[in-house]
């Protein structure tokens, strides 16, 4: 089975969630057998994900049955979900039971608070190596997906578990969504180690969050930069968390101030702080900074994970060997995915990346071979650690209101430019609803005209 789950102690807990759900490794094995008897292989399944044991169990069983899952936020905007369904024609949904009435599908299997439903669509033709689909936009519901092949999830889980030194005694705190590549990686690397995943739906500001992780004696935490900003506001350094031994950060660039603060805290308290870096296209993590170097190498993403290789190239594609010279960051490894899909026909495509991924990030390497991200070449932001496409956001706003729109920003805020003052509040509300992110992450500005080049393309430099 996936992650050799059938070899784990059957009574050991694979996952516990903050709503009272519990899942043992033995129950995971049994669900796999039940699902295999109920469902043909190579079906396309939309998994509407929540941080609950039923959601996790279904994904593992479906993956092990060689069905292809697309992981989606269960709270996704219905219009965006319908768009994805019309594009890819899933034959099944794995979804919370309380959402069944919204769709009218036929339920063929119930497990805990989740159900497997038949949509009535025939499974599309798919490449035999296609194992998993994940969204690239993270939040905007773009039909552009990342195509994973068999071995991607398994290799990354194994190598991350090795890099972090996970053992069956770990109790990993997971408040990141499982449909987010980093959240899924944290789950999978713990299952690989035979450890326990603590699934948290409550956010860091909720007292229930802290009550749960204290009761369950959580041993490690993974967060995006915004998570660490909240921890700092909550006076985390004064908290009594004796069981917490490891903290990891990824999903965006942490400020140097917070990086140093948490690295120094870990060093002083005998804990470990891991800075990591990854992308959906590399099945999450591709680099990590050894915790013993964290206090000395502020802002570094470290080196490649086991079995991976990182290097820089210049604008002509030539490899850069000298330290402190900027270039595009390139990664090679068994966790590099197959490529993208934007249509149902793309699901039949083979491996287009061939084990090499051009990240689109500008980086530099120091004398010790540790890498530092300098900036991005692509037009996307990471808000709360979730990738948001500026181009897709522009399309959503322009199409909804039939207006001109331009989006820019950085990882702290998206800046939206329109030409109608009366729509400012409505635009902010719309993009907040479509992305599922709080409205304070969006700034809407009214300008006289959207600046453009002679070619008609938007001149973003005039907006920044």
Per-region residue spans from a language model:
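Gly/Ser/Thr-rich phosphate-binding loop
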Residues: 218-223, 232-296, 309
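Conserved AMP-binding/adenylation subdomain of ANL enzymes
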Residues: 154-171, 179-220, 305
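Conserved C-terminal "lid"/linker of ANL adenylate-forming enzymes
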Residues: 381, 408, 415, 430-464
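Conserved AMP-binding A3 loop
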Residues: 24, 130-158
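Conserved AMP-binding/adenylate-forming core of the ANL superfamily
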Residues: 11-39, 82, 148-151
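Conserved ATP-binding/catalytic segment of the ANL
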Residues: 324, 328-391, 399
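Conserved AMP-binding/adenylate-forming
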Residues: 34-75, 175-177, 387
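Conserved pre-ATP/AMP-binding loop-to-beta segment of ANL
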Residues: 9-11, 50, 113, 117-135, ...
């Amino acid at each position: 089975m996936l992650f050799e789950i059938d070899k784990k102690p059957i009574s050991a807990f694979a996952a516990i969630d903050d709503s009272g759900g519990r899942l043992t490794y033995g129950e995971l094995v049994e669900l796999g057998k039940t699902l295999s008897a109920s469902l043909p292989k190579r079906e396309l399944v939309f998994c509407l994900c929540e941080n609950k044991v039923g959601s996790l169990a279904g994904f593992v069983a479906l993956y092990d049955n060689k069905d292809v899952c697309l992981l989606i936020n269960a709270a996704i905007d219905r219009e965006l979900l319908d768009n994805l369904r019309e594009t890819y024609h899933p034959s099944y949904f794995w979804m919370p039971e309380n959402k069944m009435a919204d769709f009218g599908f036929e339920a063929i299997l119930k497990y805990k608070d989740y159900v497997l439903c038949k949509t009535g669509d025939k499974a599309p033709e798919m490449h035999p190596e296609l194992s998993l689909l994940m969204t690239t936009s993270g939040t905007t519901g773009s039909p552009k997906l990342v195509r994973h092949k068999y071995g991607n999830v398994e290799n990354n889980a194994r190598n991350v578990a090795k890099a972090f030194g996970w053992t069956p005694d770990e109790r990993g705190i997971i408040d990141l969504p499982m449909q987010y590549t980093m959240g899924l990686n944290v789950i999978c690397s713990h299952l690989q180690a035979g450890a326990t995943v603590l699934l948290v739906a409550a956010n860091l500001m909720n007292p229930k969050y802290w009550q749960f992780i204290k009761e369950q004696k959580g041993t490690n935490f993974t967060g995006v930069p915004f998570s660490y900003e909240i921890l700092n506001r909550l006076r985390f350094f004064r908290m009594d968390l004796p069981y917490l031994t490891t903290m990891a950060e990824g999903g965006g660039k942490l400020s140097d101030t917070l990086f140093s603060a948490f690295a120094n805290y870990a060093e002083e308290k005998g804990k470990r702080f891991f800075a990591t870096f990854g992308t959906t296209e590399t099945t999450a993590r591709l680099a990590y900074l050894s915790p013993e170097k964290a206090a000395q190498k502020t802002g570094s993403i470290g080196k490649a994970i086991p079995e991976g290789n990182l290097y820089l190239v210049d604008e002509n594609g030539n490899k850069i060997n000298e330290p402190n010279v900027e270039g595009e960051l390139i990664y090679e490894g068994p966790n590099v995915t197959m490529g993208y899909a934007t249509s149902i026909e793309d699901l039949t495509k083979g491996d287009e990346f061939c084990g090499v991924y051009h990240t689109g990030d500008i980086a530099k390497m120091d004398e010790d071979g540790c890498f530092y991200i300098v900036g991005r070449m692509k037009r996307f932001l990471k808000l709360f650690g979730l990738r948001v496409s500026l181009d897709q956001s522009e399309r959503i706003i322009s199409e909804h209101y039939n207006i001109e729109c331009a989006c820019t920003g950085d990882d702290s805020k998206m800046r939206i430019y329109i030409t109608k003052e009366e729509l400012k509040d409505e635009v902010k509300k719309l993009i907040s609803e479509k992305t599922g992110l709080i409205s304070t992450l969006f700034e809407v500005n009214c300008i006289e005209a959207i600046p453009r080049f002679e070619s008609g393309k938007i001149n973003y430099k005039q907006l920044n």
